Amino acid sequence: MIPQVATLDFETKGIEARPVYPPKPVGCAIRLPGDRGSSYLAWGHPYENNIKEKDAKKILLDIIKNMPVLFHNASFDFSVGVEWLGWPVDTPWQNIHDTLFLAFLHDPRDRSLSLKPWADKYLGMPPDEQDELKAWILENVPGAHDHRGRKVKNPELFWGALISEAPGGLVGKYAKGDTDRTWEMFKYTWKRVIEEQGMLEGYNRERRNLRVFDGMSDEGIKVNRKLLGSDIKKYESRLSYLDKTICRKLGRTFDVGSGPQLADALDKADMMERWVLTPTGKRSTAKDNLIPNIRDQKLVNLLGERSTLVFYLSTFIKRWHEDSIGTDRIYPGFHQVRSTNEYGGGSSGARTGRPSSSNPNLLNVPKYKRVLEKPWGKNLPNI
């Protein structure tokens, strides 16, 4: 039998990285057991609000304390409730359902586990109200845009981050569509994943771990910024030495980090046995294509060390040092399953469902623990 749940979906201010997370809510869509449709409590929009924040808080607190609740991506919505509305952080896991987990168990190979694309594909519920809201924001909010990608200027002005700036009535139509989709998705996946495939144990495992993963993300990891800073100076000095040595070895001064310039220098010094070409016909300077074809072993060693050093400096050491400014902590997001940011593009989590992390990536656990500071009364594991 399908559990009777209250389906909830928060609309919030724009999402920022931890520790400035989760964002402040401006409204919440609700679909209670037995309801034929959803309602929307709007309290933080510029206009067309229908309830005071304190009254909405009482209603939502009563729901979370007295009945099971359903979200799509409970990690986000439950965190919003805990941070801003006083929800009990120790709410029993049995009372929190998540269609993101069910969608993953239904088919982890699906191109998208996001609510709207999934509901469109399996339930025939196209996101028409999203198009209406998007058009309003692009027309009425100065600077709003719909460009995706990591290199986009002013990502905070992406239309999906500005939903709180739209009128409560219009956002309510959009948000109610999401809770209706979530409830229909719950019924669809519960029948197929739980009743037909017997995967209740797997679903419950993900639910039990939900607050564990969120807790790790919220607490962050303390780092030794002083040591990181000295390491940056040391390894940047080593990188400069490697670049100068490589230039001397090849008989010319050039930017070793530039693929085309490195290829030209290797050619002129007659250091290549052969070139592996890219699909566009250019000489590939990717490590795996370059190293096996260089004639000089000392040059191979220099370029190999440089490649490793650049990777660790950019991916870990500098990133950790920058991200920990003001807090002495880094705040990676820990993920249970793959999920997609339906507004800004990109995804997090692993397709296989294994635990993963991002922003920054901590899958490569440091073997030497001197850069990490253990919390008081706790120990770091030996590796």
Pin down the residues of each PLM region.
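Conserved "right-hand" nucleotidyltransferase catalytic core of DNA-directed polymerases
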Residues: 1-30, 37-38, 110, 120-127, ...
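Conserved catalytic palm subdomain of right-hand nucleotidyl-transferase polymerases, strongest
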Residues: 7-8, 72, 96-101, 382-383
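Residue-level signal for well-ordered alpha-helical scaffold segments within enzymatic catalytic domains
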Residues: 62, 79-83, 104, 117-121, ...
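Switch/connector loops and helix/strand junctions flanking conserved nucleotide-binding motifs
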Residues: 77-81, 112-115, 128-131
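Conserved beta-strand -> loop -> alpha-helix junction used to position metal-binding or nucleic-acid-contacting
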Residues: 88-108, 115-117
